[in-house]
């Protein structure tokens, strides 16, 4: 049985052992690559560029949705935390998370599973 999974804020796909799993649609608002100060490569390479607050998927499309949105509202412009995890807008973060949660529930099938991390 094919299980359709959406990672709505995949970032560098740290959540996954198999970063090429064909069952997972990796989505993020950005595509980004950088070398961190300790020499590690940071690569954000989603399948789909998209905004978790306004997803372009049909209702009830996924069996499992992973929602691990950015959780920082303050960070320096060159902060590795901001580069790795992204930033929420200081003025709208509560509304952004609420809209994202609602979108995740919309694209999740009835009786599906939401992982809110």
Predicted regions, residues:
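Class I S-adenosyl-L-methionine-dependent methyltransferase catalytic core
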Residues: 1-117
